[in-house]
Every structure is written in C-alpha cells, then in structure tokens.
Amino acid sequence: MNGFSHFNEQGRAQMVDISEKSSTVRTAAAVSSVHMKNEVYEKIQSHDIGKGDVLAVAQVAGIMAAKQTSNIIPMCHPLSLSGVDISFDWKIKEAEVILHIKAQVKTKGSTGVEMEALTSASVCALTVYDMCKALDKGMVIGPTFLLEKTGGKNGDFKRELSEYNLEDQK
C-alpha cells in the first residue's frame, strides 16, 4: 500500500510489528491552543470557574491522555512513558486571549511518542473547553500539531513555524 505501514498485503489495517526495532530514547512535543473571550481568561486566572482549577485539571487530563493513547488510537502501541510535561502560555490580544498548550512526552522504546504528545495536547484543550463552556461556547480549539520529535530511524523533526504562520504557537 505505497508507504503506509498500517496496511497488510490485503489492504487491511494492521498494527505494525516493532519487535525488530532497537530501543532508543524518543521524545515528541505537540501544541494546541484555545481561543477564548477575555472574561473566560480572567475567571481562569482568578480561579472563579465552578468546576475547579482549570489548568490543574487540564494538566492532569493531558498526562492521563498520553498514558491512554493506545486505547483510543487503534494502531498505536501501548508504551511505557518515561515522562509527560504540560506547559501553558497565555497570549493576550485585543479581541481575545489564546491559551497555548505544549505537551512534551519521552520514552525509551521501539516506537515514537508523537501520537501521545498530540493526544495529550488535544485532551488538555478539550478539558479547558469542557470546564469553561458555560461561559463561552464559542471558544475555538487549534491549531494542534506536532512541534518536534527526536529519536528513531527516521531521525529528528522540527516544524518551521514560519511556514504555516504559526510563530506565536511556540
């Protein structure tokens, strides 16, 4: 099937056999964002959201999501993660506030952690939305993308943010 490793000879889905791949340190970082009204930002900052500390809950949700990625992405291998770190950065604009979320994941294993990082960043953003939707159902999530990855036979990857007009997503 022309370069896609998740298909067998019959064109059906398969989980790739990684038993012959060497175990190396692998990392990945993914980002997402939540665009919201100033009012939502102020309530998050003052811990005035009825459901609790939004960023603390989102952080735990992101860590849990990284650990559970193989349960929701069918062809992902279950991995023993060495670490997951979530960071948040606010960008305050005139008409809106943007919460930038960065998920960094690390393992020593036979396959990469890109999907774990992407899942983690996505679930963080979804959790923020869930906890704040009573104030602003018009929040926008995204973009969500892989920022960088290291390790593995395909080598390292680092996204050039200027290519996609994403300089403020760092």
UniProtKB/Swiss-Prot annotation:
Q: Which residues form the active site?
A: D130
Specify whether Lyase is a keyword of the entry.
Answer: yes
Membrane spanning residue stretches: none
The entry marks the following residues as binding substrate, namely M75, C76, H77, M115, E116
Query: Could you tell me which pathway this protein works in?
Result: Cofactor biosynthesis; molybdopterin biosynthesis
Q: Which GO terms describe its biological process?
A: Mo-molybdopterin cofactor biosynthetic process
Q: Which family does it belong to?
A: Belongs to the MoaC family.
Which protein, by its recorded name, is this?
A: Cyclic pyranopterin monophosphate synthase
- Gene source species: Bacillus subtilis (strain 168)
Q: Which gene encodes it?
A: moaC
